[in-house]
Amino acid sequence: MRIHVLSDLHQEFGEVDVPTVECDCVVLAGDVSTKHHGLKWIRRRFPAVPVIYICGNHEFYGEKLPKLTKRLREEAEGTNVHFLEDGFLTIGGIHFFACTLWTDLALHGDWFTGVVEAGTTMNDYKRIRISTQGYRHLAPRDTRRLHMASLEAMRQFFASHDPAHSVIVSHHAPSMRSLPENRRSEPISCAYASHLDGFIEQHQPQLWVHGHIHHSSDYRIGRTRVLTNPRGYPEEPNRSFVPNLVVSVDADAAHRSELSRPLRKTVRKNVRP
């Protein structure tokens, strides 16, 4: 299966020209644009190929997190765009699990310090609201809770799907190794990545695609390939961004013929509020 991998297009700052490539599906690992505008662009740009789309942190800016999640799911329903949040989808024998995967803020071992650092530094906690009934802003305790919920949903996914034929899509990074080396020791890096190396080694999905960090990376944790292809901000573009990047994943020979069949969809509805 050929997957067109993109993230962090940040079209709130202007539309990005993405080329048409030959692929079996497109993965957009968050921060396409703010609010619901990214979904509208995706439907125009990729009308004829299955698309797996998740929210990054920027989609939620100016929004209530649960409300936008519900809206995007409803607007994507019945289209070729599969908006997932702690949900999964099977295409051609490859199982995709996707979520924003907020970090646990414990990258350096001390989650309390991470909570303080992220809470005072990250715009996420100033520009995103969490309550559907009131106006409370998102707080670090919320993103830690959401991280734990996503990790538990992923464990349940691995319990019923072959990891060797699975692809994980997240916005936030699963390992410090995705960060540039000169950024790894910074206290705020806990808001960009979690230390899930052991989790990955335990389950060994074939591929893990993420975004959020505007720095391209491609490495392995055990048998798992970890990959990101972010465009970044227009004033600070990622010069290693490859707009036509296509990566291949392998399915069982028995599943290869499914690529020409209608999509088999097994989406688990969002387990979050």
Residue map of PLM features:
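A basic- and aromatic-enriched beta-loop-alpha substructure that forms the phosphate/nucleotide-
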Residues: 52-59, 64-125
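Active-site neighborhood of phospho(di)ester-bond hydrolases with catalytic His/Asp-centered motifs
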Residues: 5-7, 26-31, 52-57, 82-86, ...
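Beta-strand-turn-beta hairpins that frame and shape the catalytic cleft
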Residues: 1-4, 88-98, 165, 220-225
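Active-site-proximal loop/helix segment associated with metal-binding centers of metalloenzymes
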Residues: 97-167, 174-183
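N-terminal active-site segment of His-dependent metallophosphoesterases
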Residues: 1-54, 59-68, 140
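Active-site environment of divalent metal-dependent phosphoester hydrolases
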Residues: 10-16, 33-37, 58-68, 88-90, ...
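Glycine-rich phosphate-binding loop signature in dinucleotide/nucleotide-binding domains
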Residues: 20-21, 91, 157-164, 204
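Binuclear metal-dependent phosphoesterase catalytic core
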Residues: 79, 180, 186-206, 213-273
